[in-house]
């Protein structure tokens, strides 16, 4: 998704009953499989559990389109969906934001800012490649919170009402093309592939953050240079 608008298509209605963004500390596999929690959906496979969905779209005639709404800031990421919420992120030289929309209507429910010292530094403006921009990674949700990471290395966690749970900086990544890896989750762990620099510099890491607090649980060196893939759980 670049900038401008988000489109949403019609799908069969599922009754989620009492399942909501509260309850257990992390979602069950059944919850994950009937939502779209991160980049390329459940397990990063690009496979949806839904059937009888539109296979044709036309922005001019509205064929296959339920609604369309503006996105406040540009981002190269993809939308994620959890029941009645759609999440996106965006950014420009003036700020980094996370957005939440109503699945049924496309109404913007909230937008929240992250604080980035690196972005707002007066000494040297933060520069990004046009192909990646400030918000290339797709956000991740566990059905209780939503997590977003940006080109600056800043990570923000918000609950479903838009309250900031925590914010953390991993430092500006040394990545010539810009940071674009989307996070994934295992139970309460937010897994971040943070590749940067050259292989000889040994700057690249796989990092696990506690989804509740943002604290680093563990990190493992990766013998690679800067790259742009995203981790998946198998």
Enumerate the predicted regions with their spans.
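Noncatalytic, solvent-exposed loop/strand surfaces
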Residues: 1-234
